[in-house]
Amino acid sequence: MGVPKFYRWISERYPCLSEVVKEHQIPEFDNLYLDMNGIIHQCSHPNDDDVHFRISDDKIFTDIFHYLEVLFRIIKPRKVFFMAVDGVAPRAKMNQQRGRRFRSAKEAEDKIKKAIEKGETLPTEARFDSNCITPGTEFMARLHEHLKYFVNMKISTDKSWQGVTIYFSGHETPGEGEHKIMEFIRSEKAKPDHDPNTRHCLYGLDADLIMLGLTSHEAHFSLLREEVRFGGKKTQRVCAPEETTFHLLHLSLMREYIDYEFSVLKEKITFKYDIERIIDDWILMGFLVGNDFIPHLPHLHINHDALPLLYGTYVTILPELGGYINESGHLNLPRFEKYLVKLSDFDREHFSEVFVDLKWFESKVGNKYLNEAAGVAAEEARNYKEKKKLKGQENSLCWTALDKNEGEMITSKDNLEDETEDDDLFETEFRQYKRTYYMTKMGVDVVSDDFLADQAACYVQAIQWILHYYYHGVQSWSWYYPYHYAPFLSDIHNISTLKIHFELGKPFKPFEQLLAVLPAASKNLLPACYQHLMTNEDSPIIEYYPPDFKTDLNGKQQEWEAVVLIPFIDEKRLLEAMETCNHSLKKEERKRNQHSECLMCWYDRDTEFIYPSPWPEKFPAIERCCTRYKIISLDAWRVDINKNKITRIDQKALYFCGFPTLKHIRHKFFLKKSGVQVFQQSSRGENMMLEILVDAESDELTVENVASSVLGKSVFVNWPHLEEARVVAVSDGETKFYLEEPPGTQKLYSGRTAPPSKVVHLGDKEQSNWAKEVQGISEHYLRRKGIIINETSAVVYAQLLTGRKYQINQNGEVRLEKQWSKQVVPFVYQTIVKDIRAFDSRFSNIKTLDDLFPLRSMVFMLGTPYYGCTGEVQDSGDVITEGRIRVIFSIPCEPNLDALIQNQHKYSIKYNPGYVLASRLGVSGYLVSRFTGSIFIGRGSRRNPHGDHKANVGLNLKFNKKNEEVPGYTKKVGSEWMYSSAAEQLLAEYLERAPELFSYIAKNSQEDVFYEDDIWPGENENGAEKVQEIITWLKGHPVSTLSRSSCDLQILDAAIVEKIEEEVEKCKQRKNNKKVRVTVKPHLLYRPLEQQHGVIPDRDAEFCLFDRVVNVRENFSVPVGLRGTIIGIKGANREADVLFEVLFDEEFPGGLTIRCSPGRGYRLPTSALVNLSHGSRSETGNQKLTAIVKPQPAVHQHSSSSSVSSGHLGALNHSPQSLFVPTQVPTKDDDEFCNIWQSLQGSGKMQYFQPTIQEKGAVLPQEISQVNQHHKSGFNDNSVKYQQRKHDPHRKFKEECKSPKAECWSQKMSNKQPNSGIENFLASLNISKENEVQSSHHGEPPSEEHLSPQSFAMGTRMLKEILKIDGSNTVDHKNEIKQIANEIPVSSNRRDEYGLPSQPKQNKKLASYMNKPHSANEYHNVQSMDNMCWPAPSQIPPVSTPVTELSRICSLVGMPQPDFSFLRMPQTMTVCQVKLSNGLLVHGPQCHSENEAKEKAALFALQQLGSLGMNFPLPSQVFANYPSAVPPGTIPPAFPPPTGWDHYGSNYALGAANIMPSSSHLFGSMPWGPSVPVPGKPFHHTLYSGTMPMAGGIPGGVHNQFIPLQVTKKRVANKKNFENKEAQSSQATPVQTSQPDSSNIVKVSPRESSSASLKSSPIAQPASSFQVETASQGHSISHHKSTPISSSRRKSRKLAVNFGVSKPSE
């Protein structure tokens, strides 16, 4: 375990110590050492909290093999790979092991008991007992054999293992794993030919590995460990190493930080300042806070700033010592004693705080407590008091004699007596305080001087044993510290003359250690003959196995840190008890109970034999094993204790890439509490801050000088973790110098070659972006690295090094060239490092084509045809001189996924917005959002909270801060959260379980934390129990174990993945693979080589979901050449960090399960894949129907316009961002209308199409080309319509009509000039039936998307509505309205709706109506008309598009122009979102290009506006057709439904039980446009009383979001009746208009009333009824008469709606 909390403390104090590493960023290492026990625990019991978890041995072994493979692959050691499993530990360690195993057995037992008490059914198989990971058990013996098999297999089959020496020190070799590794390192260092620049990497989880690594005094030493997360909710550990984030902790930086920590000593000490000796003393100080061998000193805790205290004391006392304390592992006792004496002041300071509290306590309760406490010590302390008093008086008299004032002398004497009394009392209490500690903790009766002297000697002896163990290895196997607690610092004295001597002894045998450390609960791990010793009452050692025991936190906070109070084993008694049983051991058991040597293995091609499988049913034998062995004796690596030399590190040596140093940039350092965030929270202690020193006066900082020194050159960035990069631009915020190169060029310009550069001056926007970049970089350096970079004068833009690639010259020479990322990243100039001598070991032996493509080597084709095919190089001697290679390619059969791509929406999980769930469940959208996230409940009440503990009772299905979602339950689309039916069912179940919790949170939505007693205030209600019940239910629910994924991850759902697997299986059955022999140019071949790892094979390839790919990486978990399909894409900030989830065609060892069959999935970077589909697209020139997803930065939460999701945006009658996709097959009528509308679209696009590039969502090249093709196909330049439009005199005129004056002028002009173009437009709709039928047979082009039948119907009506809106007033206004109303059909099911050609007369009437001149007083009913110059309807161009129409209509009604934004869908479609200033938000369907999406979205917006009319009312109730998620009667109302009627005529009893308080005055219909006076009501010149008009003098409209209330049982029960009535009422809706002389009243037949009550918005009504409502000021609609329609005549409401003030629920 090492040192608790040490790793976190050290990482936060020195923020640059660790870095998160990706595989391509790992530096080169010579030696890799694995402390295996961490891996074994990780793979065998990843989640101890799950009592249902079971795992088989073969799964454990396979996972361990895979973990080892990945670690080897990540580090790629060049010389040595050392695997060390813990063997028998020294006796000093066994006590800690014993306590840990007793605790884990008891915890497991308690968890099982709790599960059984809850009624859980546990699996019948035995659970994995983690105590079996102890030397000598059957499990460890099996693992040992399997690890030997694994090493042989890898050496024989994996090229990357064949040049490395492998050491395997198993559980049979005595010693802890990490100390066996250190023994090897010490022996290597002792050799005369040792290379001081050897690069070491040690993998392990123990914090004390930092100290171990520093004892080596090696310059290049790093620690690899898994990412440790602190402070968050405990999550299940991930077994797969691919999913694991690794940290690399650099001891090179640790050494420099320690130097800074003690640099003040350079000026204070008289002897030589030696950083190596300072590091030795630093290691010694680390032991004083406790470790595996000794307990911590009293009250000295890391999280209570113990280490700064130790360091500060050292800085104070070292100048007085005359030398260092730790002399290469030997303790200098006189110096150590002086240090401890100085440190013991802490004991008194700590007690003084306690003493002050006691004095206060005494003042409250009298002297009784102190008198009793001091009783025993009073007598002993009397002499001490007298001595101290006399001494104090002498000192006082000396001082007071100097003063001649007698009065002052008397006063001083009085004060002296008071102070002396206080000091005496303090010392008495201090001694009694320590006495109580020893009596209670150590169980002694008399705390004598001999006892204290023994304590001191034991502690110092322990420190010396540990120093030997770390520096020289085990000096005594049998020594151990015999107490559970350490003595007080102030009691460790008189130690300078101690004689410390250790007897080496012998290590325990495996079974002896098992019996010494295992509890009785794990007795089955021992041979049967020993088991009775742990359980039989007559056993001579039964007292060492207590069934129950106590633990003592002893000042610690976590239970796992507590002292386990079990007796120490008496070695002699243990061995005597075992002696009587040894004769019963079986032969196999005797073999397990012995020590064995370490194995050294290496590859020998001349050695070949069959290695048998340790488990033939699971693992195959190795047919051609090429491994040689050497046995290393147990003491071969022991170094003489006096020969342990310290390596002197050459400070002027070359910089080794990947081993960071702080030396390259001038800076100063200081300690400050800056809250640097290394882990999940800001640090609370001091941070070692680094401040970069910049000479502001220097000419070097001018942008011209910076550009001339770095542009086009290689520099190192990201100080102090330097990475090489190529500079492509430099800017100072005003001017920018950049390389002017042909596309694809990535050349370094060295020497006198001047790079081709260009200078530009930045505009305001670019200058603002530059400032933001600088601010972002500065904040990152400060918040994460603790580096202050100060003022920035220049920013360098560079491409990071991704790897090296073989390039072939024209003459056939082969060079290994650096490859740079396409992505350009900004770095501030003062953090880059130039002109450093870096050591580069990546030399290549490959010089010619023959070297690069040897006979029978594997290659991949990067040209067409046969793109991505695997090939084998043949003899090319006759063609290689011509620069060609002969290859035989295998061409396998490929599955056809086109049909699946087209129909993917049928298999995708459907997600809905939160308010749809809210409607179905009968709760508010706020509750849906809150309960699917986190909800914290504290103990007690808000007024009287009980402690700081808070329980999270949220479902945890979405994580905004972490940008994570739970696939299958939640999905983030842009900035909106969507929910599946599974999430809905989970919420419904929660609502049924805890309705009172929902009710309370709905009423108190403004609070962040809720309290038990406030939610359940009743005396009989136990809030704590209720919270515990909820937590138990949540933990037991399967959703609690589901994994989260990043919202940036685009995925295909499991159902689609299953269909892909089916297609692949069908393809396999065809088996028509063929082979072809071709000669290929070498640059079109890719050969997998280790030197090329990290390089993308084909940089032009673009990756999409459904793409077919092949793995081209050798010595990888995935077999080279295996094909698969991309089923997920995880974006990242860097190109190299993008990961693809691939479903492979075959199962393979180490394969993951990613929504697919077991063992067929894996996550790979771009550099490991060749995209087969990209080759197909290149060959055919066709673009795929799925989304093009180039490796791109992860989408930030705020950039909704470029957000990527896997949802499917549908079309019409659905909520904004609804994921509904129409699946109905278009009918013949649909096609007829579609053809008409597309012909109109095509003929109207060219004039207004202006390709624009969105700032956040750049148009992809493919999309632009598609758009251009689409426009070209619309019409020919020579067509009549085109010529007519080209010469349209009104085009330029329209451009000028933007100012109010021009608008008024255009109004006059429009009344004079007739519009002849509209006649042609309407005549074009007159198409014969025969042509329609004929055209329907030809079909649509494949790239065009079919609209749903609803779209066609709505589109037709919308077309008519557009025309109607264009001319909305005439001289005889009422007659026109009546005429139009009669012409537009009411039933949406009639054939005439689609059959436009069958209504030629009607079209002409509409045309004549449209061409009538319009008067300026058309909008005289609109208020504040005098304050505005209204734009008049000007001449309509011959043919307009929906976008231009929408813009024109917005101008007509005084609204700003519509706002268009785009959403990129995962299957390559684009969706446009239209937002109007009146609050209307409309989404179009999925389209292939942005322009098409924009047009169709505008079309849908026009439908909405056309249906709404001028005074836009609220939109329709979206959820009327959704069924309730919960069956009737399951959700009780949160409040009893009140009786009575509201003043709108609604029956309260039939309404909802309001979770959110209703506002009765807000239930009225809200206008979307200018408000209209209503007779009999007070008229306000705003939307409603109390609101202010919007800018511009007229309110653009308001749409208040409605909040659904809880559905009552009664309403749910009547659901079916409402649906029946709704279905009947939608058949037909007769409408009558009033006489000209009477008020316009809409009359609805009785059959319609129930439907009307369900559809709160007029959208669902026929268009004619809206025109009637859109009356002039003189003919206003009477609200009194129409009230019965919407309120009093309906029987009941399906959904109660609260039109409160708009409040976003997400």
Curated annotation (Swiss-Prot):
Amino acid composition bias (Basic residues), ranges on this chain: 1677-1694
One GO CC term on file: nucleus
Pfam families (UniProt xref): SH3_12 (PF18129), XRN1_D1 (PF18332), XRN1_D2_D3 (PF18334), XRN_M (PF17846), XRN_N (PF03159)
Phosphoserine: residues bearing it: 1348, 1645
Extent of Low complexity compositional bias: 1647-1657
Enzyme class at the top of the EC tree: hydrolase
PANTHER family: 5'-3' EXORIBONUCLEASE 1 (PTHR12341:SF7), 5'->3' EXORIBONUCLEASE (PTHR12341)
Functional summary from the UniProt entry: Major 5'-3' exoribonuclease involved in mRNA decay. Required for the 5'-3'-processing of the G4 tetraplex-containing DNA and RNA substrates. The kinetic of hydrolysis is faster for G4 RNA tetraplex than for G4 DNA tetraplex and monomeric RNA tetraplex. Binds to RNA and DNA. Plays a role in replication-dependent histone mRNA degradation. May act as a tumor suppressor protein in osteogenic sarcoma (OGS).
Record family assignment: Belongs to the 5'-3' exonuclease family.
This protein's name: 5'-3' exoribonuclease 1
Species in which this protein is naturally found: Homo sapiens
Gene: XRN1
